[in-house]
Amino acid sequence: MKRSLSGIQPSGILHIGNYFGAMKQFVDLQDSYDGFYFIADYHSLTSLTKAETLKENTYNIVLDYLAVGLDPSKSTIFLQSNVPEHTELTWLLSNITPVGLLERGHSYKDKIAKGIPSNTGLLTYPVLMAADILIYDSDVVPVGKDQKQHLEMTRDIAMKFNQQYGVEFFKLPEPLILDDSAIVPGTDGQKMSKSYNNTINMFATKKKLKEQVMSIVTDSTPLEEPKNPDNNIAKIYALFNNIDKQNELKDKFLAGNFGYGHAKTELLNSILEYFGTAREKREELEKNMDYVKDVLNEGSKKARTIAIEKIKKAKEIVGLVGNIY
C-alpha cells in the first residue's frame, strides 16, 4: 500500500473550508493509502507566538480529526515535535538547498508582501517541509492545485541530495491533487480563511455557529421579491445537501416571499444535521483527553521508529558517524 503524508498546522480553529478542502478527503483516503498525518507544531512557530494558544490548538485539531472520522487503527496520527529527526534531517538538507530556491517560494514572497516579518524559520520553512515528507519515504502528498510548488521544492531538494551523494536515497513524492474545485466561500464571499476572519466553524457552540451563519453577507433585495439563487448561502448549502434539496432552495429564492434569513436558518439546520454525529463524538472525546494524548503518543512512537532508520542512513551517506539513538 502506498504511503500518503500530510501535515496540519495548529494555527487556529478548523472550519468547513478546511473540512471540504482536505479533512473529508483525508478520511476518504485512509482505506486506500497508508496515511501519516502529523500536527505540524514546529511549522506553526513561524506565525504563533503564544505558547498556551499553540498547546490548545494542537489538541483541538486532534479532536477535530478524530471526530470527523480519521481512524488511528488505519492512519498514523502524530506530533511533529515528538519526532526530532525531522529537524535533524532539515539541517542535512539545508546544506544542499540554494537560498535562491527558498527566496523564490510563493508562500514566502506572499507573506513578506503582507508585511509579515522575515525570519530564518519563514525562509527555511520548505526545507523542514521537505524533511517531513522525505523521512517517511512518502509516495504521495495530498495538496491543492495552488500548493503544487511546495511539493516541487521538496522534489528539487531530494534530487539535489541524491545527485550530490550519488545515491537513490530519497523517494520523489508525487502530488495527490485534492478536489478543490468547489472552493468554499466565506461569510464575506471571499475564499473561507482564518486570515479573512470569515469562517464557519463546524464545532462551534450552536449559539456561535448561528452567529457565523447569520453574518453571511447578502444584498438588500426585499423579502417579497425574487432573489438571485446563485448567492453565497446557496453555494455553502450545496455542500451539505443533494441536488433535489438544492433545487428546492433555488425555487424558493426565485418565487419570492423567502428571505435571506429564512435561507440562513435552513443552512444552519443543514450544518447541524451534517455534523451531528461528529459534534457528539467530539464532545465525548473531550471527556477522555487521556485517549487523545495516547493516540498522539502511540502514533509518534510508530513514526519515530521509521524516522530513526531513515536518518541513520542519511547521516551515513553524508559522512556523519554519530548514530546513537
UniProtKB/Swiss-Prot annotation:
GO biological process, any: tryptophanyl-tRNA aminoacylation
PROSITE patterns noted in UniProt: AA_TRNA_LIGASE_I
Residue ranges annotated as motif 'KMSKS' region: 191-195
InterPro entries listed in its UniProt record: aa-tRNA-synth_I_CS (IPR001412), aa-tRNA-synth_Ic (IPR002305), Rossmann-like_a/b/a_fold (IPR014729), Trp-tRNA-ligase (IPR002306), Trp-tRNA-ligase_bac-type (IPR024109), Trp-tRNA_synthetase (IPR050203)
Residues reported in the UniProt entry to bind ATP: Q9, P10, S11, G17, N18, G144, K145, D146, V184, K191, M192, S193, K194, S195
Location in or out of the cell: Cytoplasm
Domain of life from the UniProt record: Bacteria
Catalytic activity annotation: tRNA(Trp) + L-tryptophan + ATP = L-tryptophyl-tRNA(Trp) + AMP + diphosphate + H(+)
UniProt keyword terms in alphabetical order: Aminoacyl-tRNA synthetase, ATP-binding, Cytoplasm, Ligase, Nucleotide-binding, Protein biosynthesis
Motif ('HIGH' region): 10-18
Cellular component, GO annotation: cytosol
Principal location: cytoplasm
Positions annotated to bind L-tryptophan: D132
EC numbers: 6.1.1.2
Subunit organization: Homodimer.
The protein's role, per its UniProt record: Catalyzes the attachment of tryptophan to tRNA(Trp).
Recorded family membership: Belongs to the class-I aminoacyl-tRNA synthetase family.
NCBIfam families in UniProt: trpS (TIGR00233)
Protein name (Swiss-Prot/TrEMBL): Tryptophan--tRNA ligase
Organism: Fusobacterium nucleatum subsp. nucleatum (strain ATCC 25586 / DSM 15643 / BCRC 10681 / CIP 101130 / JCM 8532 / KCTC 2640 / LMG 13131 / VPI 4355)
Lineage summary: Bacteria, Fusobacteriati, Fusobacteriota, Fusobacteriia, Fusobacteriales
Gene that this sequence comes from: trpS
